[in-house]
């Protein structure tokens, strides 16, 4: 007997949108078809008029715990994810303490296991801790980074020498490096030059397009020389997209798979430098808001496959922290709950096709971060039943008072969105009828591919000792 029977729905399957029914048992999709004769099931969801899609995978969140729980914690952040159709997240390391060694990793893992209602991975931080990276990899971190090439929240930025050393070590481990690409030297020079500027768009001026482009170019050269797998976080500029497109074209011409992937955020897709006046310091994030030419390049890159995925860079701060002058306010905006609804609205408005939305919010993130091996990322028999059920006709404005993050505000206030009616995680309904339907701690830790058990470590030590 199936646990859940979804009927009267439509799915995107084998390159077309078609009517279907889905049976779910023991957390997995067990059957996809039509007109099932099911005598009974624990739950029947009549999805008349709605689409059933893979739930989102957000590879870039800052859930702020430990150390900054006034802004967010694992429970509130994961509730926001579930309410927005996200069933898997990957948390970044710039917490207090940062996730840079065994102790800090195990502290964060314990908290996440106790509180998260969605499945999760944890990235390892990179500072001067090169000797700790192997240990973190074997503990099960998903990837390393984001590695900050320039100053940002948490103070984990590193210099050029350490950056190269880190990438070399990550290459040895066979791991993935995730990169925040901004040129710190350029940023500091512009900060000094513009120290009298008090306008809100000051932040875009000290981190201009050239700041990102310079860092991306430097990183691409290192990636190529070291042959390390890498992922660029939150690309935001016309210039960076052009570089990525060129490198991918050259790889394809030589019948090679690119060594890197890249992401874009909803705030760089759907907000612009024109929003500074409306948002003031609430629009401050790293990298900053960009002009219309960059936004057009991002949309084109998303459609033609240059950009691999969309991630929220959910980085919440309280209203009281953001309601300051542009220099004093911290960088970052909340976004995990609005990622999928904004992307669904973009499909509704023909900004990108549904098939591409599914690729950039689920399948591509799963592949890039090794989650496909754990059954994530696709609506197919044998995969985890991580699903969202949405009625694309239900376009509604985003309101901060309907969201679940502790931030209490959103830069997307009033913008069109399509929110899910149901979110399922491993066959459990965690969001339905506008309410959370899951207990803290039901989320599972998704071990990275470098994970080793204590037995493996002992065996490895014995083998090393006998050489």
From Swiss-Prot:
Binding residue positions for substrate: 62-64, 94, 317
EC class of the enzyme, as a word: hydrolase
Gene designation: pyrC
Residues covered by region (Disordered): 439-467
GO cellular-component term (any): cytoplasm
InterPro entries per UniProt: Amidohydro-rel, DHOase, DHOase/Allantoinase_Hydrolase, Dihydroorotase_CS, Metal-dep_hydrolase_composite, Metal_Hydrolase
Gene3D superfamilies reported in the protein's UniProt record: Metal-dependent hydrolases (3.20.20.140), Urease, subunit C, domain 1 (2.30.40.10)
Cofactor(s) listed in the protein's UniProt record: Zn(2+)
Active site residues according to the UniProt entry: 313
Biological process terms in GO annotation: 'de novo' UMP biosynthetic process; purine nucleobase catabolic process
Binding annotation for Zn(2+) 1: 60, 62, 146, 313
Function: Catalyzes the reversible cyclization of carbamoyl aspartate to dihydroorotate.
Bias-annotated ranges (Basic and acidic residues): 441-454
Organism superkingdom: Archaea
Source species of the chain: Methanosarcina acetivorans (strain ATCC 35395 / DSM 2834 / JCM 12185 / C2A)
Keyword vocabulary terms for this entry: Hydrolase, Metal-binding, Pyrimidine biosynthesis, Zinc
CDD domains on file: DHOase_IIb
Pfam families linked: Amidohydro_1
Protein's recorded name: Dihydroorotase
Annotated positions binding Zn(2+) 2: 146, 180, 234
Cofactor binding, note field: Binds 2 Zn(2+) ions per subunit.
Catalytic activity: (S)-dihydroorotate + H2O = N-carbamoyl-L-aspartate + H(+)
PROSITE patterns attached to this UniProt entry: DIHYDROOROTASE_1 (PS00482), DIHYDROOROTASE_2 (PS00483)
């Amino acid at each position: 007997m199936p646990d859940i029977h979804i009927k009267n729905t439509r799915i995107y399957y084998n390159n077309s949108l078609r009517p279907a029914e889905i049976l779910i048992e023991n957390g997995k999709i067990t059957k996809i078809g039509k007109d099932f004769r099911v005598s009974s099931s624990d739950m029947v969801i009549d999805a008349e008029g709605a689409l059933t899609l893979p739930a989102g995978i957000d590879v870039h969140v800052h859930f702020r715990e430990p150390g900054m729980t006034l802004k967010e914690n694992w429970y509130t952040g994961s509730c926001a994810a579930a309410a927005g159709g996200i069933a898997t997240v990957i948390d970044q390391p710039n917490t207090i303490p940062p996730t840079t060694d065994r102790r800090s990793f195990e502290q964060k893992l314990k908290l996440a296991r106790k509180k998260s209602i969605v499945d999760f991975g944890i990235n390892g931080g990179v500072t001067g801790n090169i000797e700790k990276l192997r240990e973190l990899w074997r503990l099960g971190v998903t990837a390393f980074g984001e590695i900050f090439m320039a100053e940002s929240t948490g103070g984990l930025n590193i210099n050029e020498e350490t950056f190269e050393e880190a990438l070399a070590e990550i290459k040895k481990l066979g791991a993935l490096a995730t990169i925040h690409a901004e040129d710190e030297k350029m940023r500091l020079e512009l900060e000094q030059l513009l120290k009298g500027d008090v306008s809100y768009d000051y932040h875009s001026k000290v981190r201009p397009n050239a700041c990102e482009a310079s860092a991306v170019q430097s990183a691409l050269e290192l990636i190529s020389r070291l042959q390390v797998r890498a992922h660029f976080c939150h690309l935001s500029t016309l210039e960076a997209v052009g570089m990525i497109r060129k490198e991918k074209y050259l790889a394809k011409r030589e019948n090679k798979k690119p060594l890197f992937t890249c992401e874009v955020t909803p705030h760089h897709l759907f907000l612009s430098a024109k929003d500074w006046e409306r948002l003031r310091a609430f629009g401050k994030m790293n990298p900053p808001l960009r002009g219309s030419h960059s936004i057009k390049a991002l949309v084109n890159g998303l459609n033609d496959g240059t950009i691999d995925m969309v991630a929220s860079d959910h980085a919440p701060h309280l209203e009281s922290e953001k309601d300051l002058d542009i220099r004093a306010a911290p960088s970052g905006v909340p976004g995990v709950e609005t990622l999928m609804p904004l992307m669904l609205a973009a499909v509704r408005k023909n900004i990108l096709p549904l098939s591409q939305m599914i690729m950039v919010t689920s399948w591509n993130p799963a592949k890039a971060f090794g989650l496909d091996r754990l059954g994530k990322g696709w609506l197919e028999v044998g995969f985890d039943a991580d699903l969202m059920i949405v009625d694309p006709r239900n376009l509604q404005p985003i309101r901060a008072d309907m969201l679940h993050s502790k931030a209490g505000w959103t830069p997307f206030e009033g913008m069109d969105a399509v929110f899910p009616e149901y979110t399922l995680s491993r066959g459990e309904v965690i969001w339905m009828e506008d309410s959370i339907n899951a207990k803290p701690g039901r989320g599972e830790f998704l071990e990275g591919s470098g994970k080793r058990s204590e037995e493996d470590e002992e065996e490895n030590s014995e083998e090393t000792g006998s050489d």
